[in-house]
From Swiss-Prot:
Pathway: Porphyrin-containing compound metabolism; heme O biosynthesis; heme O from protoheme: step 1/1. It holds the Pfam family UbiA. InterPro entries: Protohaem_IX_farnesylTrfase, UbiA_prenyltransferase, UbiA_prenylTrfase_CS, UbiA_sf. Its main location: membrane. Converts heme B (protoheme IX) to heme O by substitution of the vinyl group on carbon 2 of heme B porphyrin ring with a hydroxyethyl farnesyl side group. It catalyses: heme b + (2E,6E)-farnesyl diphosphate + H2O = Fe(II)-heme o + diphosphate. Carbon 2 of the heme B porphyrin ring is defined according to the Fischer nomenclature. This is Protoheme IX farnesyltransferase. Keywords: Cell inner membrane, Cell membrane, Heme biosynthesis, Membrane, Transferase, Transmembrane, Transmembrane helix. Belongs to the UbiA prenyltransferase family. Protoheme IX farnesyltransferase subfamily. GO terms for biological process: heme O biosynthetic process. It is a multi-pass membrane protein. It comes from Prochlorococcus marinus (strain MIT 9515). One of its GO terms (cellular component) is plasma membrane.
Length: 332
């Protein structure tokens, strides 16, 4: 009995540390419903989509309008998600103190705010960017609220696999903002985010599987268990690594430096996945993988931006010159 109690306390403490800022930083109620912690990564992948185009860097006004519109749309999506799941949040201890279930904000107030943010995002993107970027942004919003939150999340363990399309749309927005269309490079980053999402989210779901099970949400770890989930994480992790390497062909230039700098990111991701495979119920290892997966995607986007600098281009040219010199020297 004592060991079970100690194990419960350990798991509870780990769950409370997954996103420690929820404990340490009290957000204003109106900001909390916008889920601001999710927005920076969405904007990072938007920048990544831009960096894959020949038109990078964009003019400052277009860049600001794209990122501003994306942030407003993401805030609207977060608020609408909170509205739909308000009753669900009331039943979960972890979420019962959120702004809506606790009564800090009313349904009408949040709904009005979400509609206002959606309208502002559309106007900003239409006037400052183009119709395609605006349409894709609204498609991402609807995908998150309707496809994932309403349709898939309460019905299938594969909810995040197909619902992950919402989080993968920002690279398409970035590419379309830069060029007016979505090329193959933009679709590459879309695919990378789609493959990365299950491994990223299921690591978090392992930590919260009891919470999801208590309210009947069929997250994969809650239904199939941690061991089964970690095997799925491993498959998606390897697919993510393979897809990330293909980025060398997606970049207009600077791909050599990208693929070299990519190695430690992929190595660390696979290392953490293998550690979790050895102990699927180890919440510390699940937490470590979840946190690194966030840094991983930020890192990928940063590498894409670095690869478009003159330094990266010069490195690639000098490397090619060295290769050709060695080839001539050895008569290859």
């Amino acid at each position: 009995m004592k060991s079970n109690l100690e194990n419960f306390n350990f798991q509870t403490s780990i769950r409370e540390q997954v996103v420690p800022s929820r404990k340490k930083v009290i957000l204003p109620a109106w900001l909390e419903v916008a889920k601001p912690r999710l927005i920076p990564l969405l904007l990072a992948t938007t920048l990544g989509g831009m960096a894959l185009t020949e038109e990078w860097p964009l003019s400052s006004p277009k860049l600001i309008c794209t990122l501003g519109g994306g942030a407003l749309a993401a805030a609207a999506a977060g608020a609408l998600n909170c509205l739909w799941e308000m009753d669900l949040d009331k039943r979960m201890k972890r979420t019962s103190n959120r702004a809506l279930p606790s009564g800090k904000l009313s349904f009408n107030t949040v709904f009005l705010g979400a509609v206002s943010c959606t309208f502002a995002a559309a106007m900003l993107l239409i006037s400052g960017v183009n119709y395609l970027a605006a349409g894709l942004t609204l498609l991402g919003l609807c995908s998150y609220v309707i496809l994932y939150t309403i349709i898939l999340k309460p019905r299938t363990t594969q909810n995040i696999v197909f619902g992950g399309v919402a989080g993968a749309i920002p690279p398409l927005v970035g590419a379309s903002a830069a060029t007016g269309h979505v090329g193959l490079s933009g679709w590459w980053l879309f695919g990378l985010v789609m493959l990365w999402t299950p491994a990223h989210f299921w690591a978090l779901a392992i930590l919260l599987k009891d919470d999801y099970a208590s309210v009947g949400i069929p997250m994969l770890p809650s239904v199939k268990g941690s061991a089964f989930t970690v095997k799925a994480i491993s498959r998606y992790g390897w697919a993510t690594v393979f897809m990330s390497i293909l980025g060398v062909f997606a970049l207009p230039e600077g791909g050599l430096l990208y693929v070299i700098m990519l190695l430690p990111f992929n190595g660390r991701l696979l290392q953490l996945i293998n550690r979790l495979k050895s102990s699927p119920d180890d919440l510390e290892k699940a937490k470590g993988l979840f946190r690194w997966s966030i840094l991983y995607m930020f890192g990928i986007c940063l590498l894409l931006l670095i690869s478009r600098t003159q330094l990266s281009v010069d490195f690639e040219q000098q490397s090619m010159q060295i290769f050709l010199s060695l080839k001539a020297y050895f008569n290859i």
